[in-house]
């Protein structure tokens, strides 16, 4: 569970007991008495559907004039966290995270400047344009049956990228001189 005071809490016994996760490095903090508290709030938390130990977390600090993308991944159930913001826009807050239901390395993030995807688990991010204007993407949903990417924006409605499944083959395609994509009947 993520809270508006920047803390992440984890329960391993169906909510009977909760432990605070405090292993994020690189987040802005403030000193309150003897406590070193985060200035950020938790924007989004997403557990992987492929590996129960993998968790993604996005933090936001725009209320303090800081628009940096704070995006992290844990591969050990929250014991340690790796910054995966990599080459996302420097002042593009991250609002939402989605993981492909087939390829665990294909991730999508909604940012202040649109949606970005990665094929390598967050090492490299690519803007996904496809007619989408440069707008804040606040929510992302994946419609698994049709492989549609549904984007909720701030003030511009929602967009649907029909059948994004060719992105799963993109890494292989980029290595080839020529490639064919499987098409959907109908």
At which residue positions do the language-model features occur?
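Beta-propeller blade termini and top-face loops
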Residues: 1-186
